A protein has these predicted regions:
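Glycine-rich "HGGG/HGxG" loop immediately N-terminal to the catalytic nucleophile
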Residues: 44, 83, 104-120, 176
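Catalytic active-site module of serine/aspartate enzymes centered on a nucleophile-bearing elbow/loop
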Residues: 293-346
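Conserved serine/cysteine hydrolase catalytic core
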Residues: 230-298
């Protein structure tokens, strides 16, 4: 009788157990350094000290089958990780580039120190130290979103090391605080970050990154982020993100675009509407923020050796939304002849 009762109870539990297993497969939990999320190439670690912290930068170093003698460094955005560059790494490596794709400190598989003065200068210096440890000096630098702001700062700090600069829907082409976006404390950003869910990520990415469209191809990147917020490091991930939010909103680079001296390929999805803190701004101001068709043209006019490539129907992440179109334009734009003979917006 007892055995029959136990078997009956177990059978009754099976649907719940199956549902739980299904949920864990579709709603994974990842560690604070994205433990459990697979990257497309082996992840290496650069260990160093900064601001009295012993830190690690995770990175992928992908060697081409037929080298062209050039190295490309890919800098990810705030809601992205080095893994999201997979298609771009493939395209560049197939074209002969050695490709180095790091996760910045505070992001993804890299260290997330609780006490750290985040600045684009510091992240640039960290990246420069990583490249020096690999014996890499002259690079083609590709930055997307927040990585675009970082790439601009890196190119300003180390102009002799950057042969070419490609900016993919970089944020920071406008100064939000100068446009009346209210200042937020790190504590306020932290409270906002704690409300992050897969649904909130998906809705934001659908409207901003992919111009109102959605594809199952995008879902792994939603779960990549949401999994860290579901996991045991949720508090640390939210705090690190808040520190980065503060850095982005208080350290504009737009006023220094005219100081860039290397050839710059500026790639803009015209459906992009990204503006950090847009929802905090007065409604009249909100409507003017994140106008990427205008911002791209204004930036290209400021940069001495700029070539502007626009994607009329794409949003904030053209390399993910339309990889074939994007990578064709990227490779064509990075050809030495294309960059050296084009000056001004196109």
């Amino acid at each position: 009788m007892a055995l029959a009762f136990a078997l009956g109870a177990l059978l009754a539990m099976m649907p719940a157990l199956e549902a739980s297993a299904a949920q864990s497969a579709t709603e994974p939990l990842y560690g604070p350094e994205l433990q459990g999320f697979p990257y497309p190439w082996p992840v290496e670690r650069f260990r160093f000290e900064s601001q009295r912290n012993r830190l690690e930068m995770a990175f992928m170093d992908v060697r081409p089958g037929s080298p062209n003698g050039r190295a490309a460094v890919l800098l990810h955005g705030k809601n992205f990780c080095a893994a999201t560059w997979k298609n771009t790494i493939d395209a560049l490596a197939n074209a002969g580039y050695r490709v180095i794709a790091p996760d910045q400190v505070g992001f993804c598989k890299s260290s997330k120190p609780t006490r750290y003065q985040y600045s684009f200068q510091q992240l640039a210096a960290n990246t420069h130290a990583l490249l020096a440890s690999l014996g890499v000096s002259h690079v083609t630098l590709v930055g997307h979103s927040t990585g675009g702001m970082l790439a601009i700062r890196y190119a300003l700090m180390y102009p002799d090391d950057v042969d070419q600069l490609a900016l993919v829907d970089p944020i920071g082409l406008e100064d939000w605080k100068a446009k009346s976006v209210p200042w937020q404390s790190v504590d306020a950003w932290y409270r906002r970050e704690l409300h992050t869910t897969a649904e909130s990520i998906r809705n934001y990415e659908r409207s901003t990154y992919y111009a109102g469209t959605w594809s199952p191809v995008y879902e792994p990147w939603v779960q990549m982020l949401a999994g860290m917020y579901r996991g045991p490091g949720r508090d640390l991930v939210a705090w690190s993100s808040a520190l980065v939010d503060d850095m982005i909103c208080t350290q504009p680079v737009v006023y220094e675009l005219s100081e860039l001296r290397m050839p710059v390929l500026l790639m803009i999805g015209d459906k992009d509407t990204t503006a950090i803190g847009k929802d905090l701004a007065p409604s009249a101001v909100r409507a003017t923020l994140g106008n990427y068709p205008a911002l791209g043209k204004e930036a290209a006019a400021r940069i001495p050796l700029a070539r502007l490539v626009e994607f009329p129907d794409l949003g904030h992440a053209p390399q993910i939304q339309a990889p074939d179109m994007f990578h064709q334009a990227l490779l064509e734009g990075l050809r030495p002849a294309a960059l050296s003979t084009n000056s001004g917006a196109r």
